[in-house]
């Protein structure tokens, strides 16, 4: 990993489980039937250079697990979300759009960032409401493997 930072967009199993539990225990009926949702896509990888930007969107998809089709939330249609590779020292911009039915943020776990880009709801950032977007300015001073995940 020679001087590169891999910000892994693997919405780790715990996050996927959190999404699934949240969606499956909600008291209100689903707004869209599972059958009408797009199928979860294969995770893609993207390499960003210093100064580049990336569009990231959260929205519901369907995925079949052990023969049962369930509604899950995905980043850019995939579970886990996109793998984002960034060189150490690079500064990138992530334009996030919340196309879900819940308020959320993105937390770049373990990355040293300004509070305004940390994604901790009602502490460092307001929740991003359904249909709204937020632009994250991220810098990567440290080499490492990181992941990003939602906060509700």
Residue map of PLM features:
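N-terminal, post-signal-peptide metal-ligating segments of extracellular/periplasmic oxidoreductases
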Residues: 2-135
